[in-house]
Amino acid sequence: MRVLGIDPGLRRTGFGVIDAEGMRLRYVASGTIVVPPALALPERLKVILDNLREVARETRPDVAALEIVFLNTNPASTLLLGQARGAALCALADSALDVHEYTALQIKKAVMGTGRAAKEQVQMMVQRLLSLDGTPAPDSADALACAICHAHVGPLHDKLDRLGTAAQLGSRPRLRNGRLVG
Protein backbone atom coordinates (compact mmCIF):
# COMPACT_ATOMS: atom_id res chain seq x y z
CA MET A 1 0.00 0.00 0.00
CA ARG A 2 1.36 3.42 -0.95
CA VAL A 3 0.36 6.17 1.51
CA LEU A 4 0.50 9.93 0.94
CA GLY A 5 0.69 11.78 4.25
CA ILE A 6 -0.05 15.49 4.46
CA ASP A 7 0.68 18.06 7.16
CA PRO A 8 -1.46 21.01 5.99
CA GLY A 9 -0.49 24.62 6.49
CA LEU A 10 -1.14 27.90 4.72
CA ARG A 11 2.55 28.89 4.70
CA ARG A 12 4.12 25.44 4.52
CA THR A 13 2.38 22.19 3.62
CA GLY A 14 4.40 19.04 4.16
CA PHE A 15 3.90 15.86 2.18
CA GLY A 16 5.41 12.42 2.51
CA VAL A 17 4.93 9.21 0.56
CA ILE A 18 5.79 5.75 1.84
CA ASP A 19 5.20 2.18 0.76
CA ALA A 20 3.91 -0.11 3.50
CA GLU A 21 3.91 -3.87 3.28
CA GLY A 22 2.78 -5.30 6.58
CA MET A 23 5.05 -3.66 9.16
CA ARG A 24 7.77 -3.00 6.57
CA LEU A 25 8.04 0.67 5.54
CA ARG A 26 9.91 2.17 2.58
CA TYR A 27 10.49 5.86 1.88
CA VAL A 28 9.30 7.06 -1.55
CA ALA A 29 9.30 10.88 -1.50
CA SER A 30 8.72 13.90 0.70
CA GLY A 31 8.89 17.65 0.59
CA THR A 32 7.44 20.95 1.66
CA ILE A 33 5.22 23.19 -0.42
CA VAL A 34 6.28 26.71 0.51
CA VAL A 35 3.50 29.17 -0.27
CA PRO A 36 4.58 32.76 -0.99
CA PRO A 37 2.98 34.93 1.72
CA ALA A 38 2.65 37.88 -0.67
CA LEU A 39 -0.04 36.05 -2.66
CA ALA A 40 -3.72 36.69 -2.01
CA LEU A 41 -5.52 33.93 -0.10
CA PRO A 42 -7.21 32.34 -3.16
CA GLU A 43 -3.86 32.11 -4.97
CA ARG A 44 -2.18 30.64 -1.89
CA LEU A 45 -4.83 27.94 -1.69
CA LYS A 46 -4.40 27.26 -5.42
CA VAL A 47 -0.65 26.74 -4.91
CA ILE A 48 -1.43 24.06 -2.31
CA LEU A 49 -4.11 22.47 -4.49
CA ASP A 50 -1.99 22.39 -7.66
CA ASN A 51 1.15 21.10 -5.94
CA LEU A 52 -0.64 18.32 -4.07
CA ARG A 53 -2.41 17.26 -7.27
CA GLU A 54 1.02 17.02 -8.91
CA VAL A 55 2.46 15.03 -5.99
CA ALA A 56 -0.48 12.59 -6.19
CA ARG A 57 -0.11 12.30 -9.98
CA GLU A 58 3.63 11.63 -9.79
CA THR A 59 3.68 9.25 -6.81
CA ARG A 60 0.36 7.42 -7.46
CA PRO A 61 -0.63 6.69 -3.83
CA ASP A 62 -3.35 4.19 -2.94
CA VAL A 63 -4.61 6.19 0.03
CA ALA A 64 -4.03 9.50 1.80
CA ALA A 65 -3.63 10.40 5.48
CA LEU A 66 -4.20 13.94 6.70
CA GLU A 67 -3.54 15.54 10.06
CA ILE A 68 -6.69 16.93 11.68
CA VAL A 69 -6.56 20.65 12.43
CA PHE A 70 -6.23 21.47 16.11
CA LEU A 71 -8.24 24.21 17.76
CA ASN A 72 -5.98 27.22 18.17
CA THR A 73 -6.42 30.02 20.68
CA ASN A 74 -6.55 32.42 17.72
CA PRO A 75 -9.79 31.75 15.78
CA ALA A 76 -8.49 33.53 12.66
CA SER A 77 -5.45 31.22 12.52
CA THR A 78 -7.68 28.18 12.94
CA LEU A 79 -9.90 29.31 10.06
CA LEU A 80 -6.91 29.92 7.77
CA LEU A 81 -5.45 26.53 8.61
CA GLY A 82 -8.85 24.99 7.90
CA GLN A 83 -8.85 26.60 4.46
CA ALA A 84 -5.41 25.16 3.69
CA ARG A 85 -6.70 21.80 4.83
CA GLY A 86 -9.70 22.24 2.52
CA ALA A 87 -7.39 22.85 -0.44
CA ALA A 88 -5.53 19.65 0.45
CA LEU A 89 -8.79 17.70 0.71
CA CYS A 90 -9.90 19.01 -2.69
CA ALA A 91 -6.61 17.88 -4.26
CA LEU A 92 -7.02 14.42 -2.73
CA ALA A 93 -10.66 14.16 -3.81
CA ASP A 94 -9.68 15.28 -7.32
CA SER A 95 -7.10 12.47 -7.32
CA ALA A 96 -9.83 9.98 -6.27
CA LEU A 97 -8.02 9.04 -3.06
CA ASP A 98 -9.63 7.75 0.11
CA VAL A 99 -8.66 10.10 2.93
CA HIS A 100 -8.07 9.03 6.51
CA GLU A 101 -7.67 11.65 9.22
CA TYR A 102 -5.64 11.49 12.40
CA THR A 103 -5.04 13.86 15.30
CA ALA A 104 -1.50 14.91 16.20
CA LEU A 105 -1.83 12.79 19.36
CA GLN A 106 -2.76 9.68 17.35
CA ILE A 107 0.13 10.27 14.95
CA LYS A 108 2.67 10.68 17.76
CA LYS A 109 1.35 7.59 19.56
CA ALA A 110 1.61 5.51 16.38
CA VAL A 111 5.16 6.68 15.62
CA MET A 112 6.63 7.22 19.10
CA GLY A 113 4.43 5.21 21.44
CA THR A 114 3.48 8.38 23.32
CA GLY A 115 1.46 11.44 22.43
CA ARG A 116 3.78 13.77 24.34
CA ALA A 117 6.81 13.53 22.03
CA ALA A 118 8.62 16.68 20.89
CA LYS A 119 8.89 17.54 17.19
CA GLU A 120 12.60 16.70 17.17
CA GLN A 121 11.89 13.25 18.60
CA VAL A 122 9.30 12.60 15.88
CA GLN A 123 11.80 13.71 13.21
CA MET A 124 14.45 11.32 14.56
CA MET A 125 12.01 8.41 14.79
CA VAL A 126 10.77 9.01 11.23
CA GLN A 127 14.41 9.01 10.10
CA ARG A 128 15.01 5.73 11.92
CA LEU A 129 11.78 4.00 10.79
CA LEU A 130 12.37 4.88 7.13
CA SER A 131 16.18 4.38 7.23
CA LEU A 132 16.81 7.90 5.95
CA ASP A 133 20.35 9.26 5.62
CA GLY A 134 19.44 12.58 7.24
CA THR A 135 16.78 14.07 9.45
CA PRO A 136 13.76 15.16 7.39
CA ALA A 137 12.60 18.78 7.52
CA PRO A 138 9.91 19.41 10.18
CA ASP A 139 6.93 19.68 7.80
CA SER A 140 8.06 16.68 5.75
CA ALA A 141 8.67 14.67 8.93
CA ASP A 142 5.16 15.44 10.19
CA ALA A 143 3.67 14.35 6.86
CA LEU A 144 5.76 11.16 6.82
CA ALA A 145 4.70 10.49 10.43
CA CYS A 146 1.06 10.85 9.35
CA ALA A 147 1.65 8.32 6.56
CA ILE A 148 3.39 5.95 9.00
CA CYS A 149 0.46 6.33 11.40
CA HIS A 150 -1.95 5.24 8.69
CA ALA A 151 0.31 2.36 7.67
CA HIS A 152 0.24 1.08 11.26
CA VAL A 153 -3.32 1.96 12.31
CA GLY A 154 -5.32 2.21 9.09
CA PRO A 155 -5.58 -1.51 8.31
CA LEU A 156 -6.84 -2.17 11.85
CA HIS A 157 -9.47 0.56 11.52
CA ASP A 158 -10.55 -0.87 8.17
CA LYS A 159 -11.00 -4.33 9.70
CA LEU A 160 -12.92 -2.91 12.66
CA ASP A 161 -15.13 -0.88 10.31
CA ARG A 162 -15.92 -4.03 8.35
CA LEU A 163 -16.84 -5.74 11.60
CA GLY A 164 -18.97 -2.77 12.62
CA THR A 165 -17.22 -2.31 15.95
CA ALA A 166 -15.05 0.76 15.36
CA ALA A 167 -17.64 3.19 16.72
CA GLN A 168 -18.16 1.06 19.83
CA LEU A 169 -14.43 0.93 20.55
CA GLY A 170 -14.01 4.67 20.06
CA SER A 171 -11.18 4.21 17.56
CA ARG A 172 -12.06 7.33 15.58
CA PRO A 173 -11.52 10.86 16.86
CA ARG A 174 -14.58 12.56 18.32
CA LEU A 175 -15.48 15.88 19.93
CA ARG A 176 -15.65 16.22 23.70
CA ASN A 177 -16.27 19.68 25.19
CA GLY A 178 -15.37 21.26 21.84
CA ARG A 179 -12.03 19.40 21.58
CA LEU A 180 -10.99 16.47 19.45
CA VAL A 181 -10.16 13.36 21.43
CA GLY A 182 -8.82 10.10 20.00
Swiss-Prot record:
InterPro entries named among the record's database cross-references: RNaseH-like_sf (IPR012337), RNaseH_sf (IPR036397), X-over_junc_endoDNase_Mg_BS (IPR020563), X-over_junc_endoDNase_RuvC (IPR002176)
EC number of the protein: 3.1.21.10
Residues reported in the UniProt entry to bind Mg(2+) 1: D7, D139
Catalytic reaction annotation: Endonucleolytic cleavage at a junction such as a reciprocal single-stranded crossover between two homologous DNA duplexes (Holliday junction)
Cysteines joined through disulfide linkages: none
Function of the molecule: The RuvA-RuvB-RuvC complex processes Holliday junction (HJ) DNA during genetic recombination and DNA repair. Endonuclease that resolves HJ intermediates. Cleaves cruciform DNA by making single-stranded nicks across the HJ at symmetrical positions within the homologous arms, yielding a 5'-phosphate and a 3'-hydroxyl group; requires a central core of homology in the junction. The consensus cleavage sequence is 5'-(A/T)TT(C/G)-3'. Cleavage occurs on the 3'-side of the TT dinucleotide at the point of strand exchange.
One example GO MF annotation: DNA binding
Biological process annotations from GO: DNA recombination; DNA repair
Catalytic residue positions: D7, E67, D139
Pfam family, one: RuvC
Name the UniProt record assigns to this protein: Crossover junction endodeoxyribonuclease RuvC
Subunit structure, as described in the record: Homodimer which binds Holliday junction (HJ) DNA. The HJ becomes 2-fold symmetrical on binding to RuvC with unstacked arms; it has a different conformation from HJ DNA in complex with RuvA. In the full resolvosome a probable DNA-RuvA(4)-RuvB(12)-RuvC(2) complex forms which resolves the HJ.
NCBIfam families, alphabetized: ruvC (TIGR00228)
Cofactor descriptive note: Binds 2 Mg(2+) ion per subunit.
Predominant subcellular localization, coarse grouping: cytoplasm
Cofactor(s) the protein needs: Mg(2+)
Keywords: Cytoplasm, DNA damage, DNA recombination, DNA repair, DNA-binding, Endonuclease, Hydrolase, Magnesium, Metal-binding, Nuclease
Subcellular location: Cytoplasm
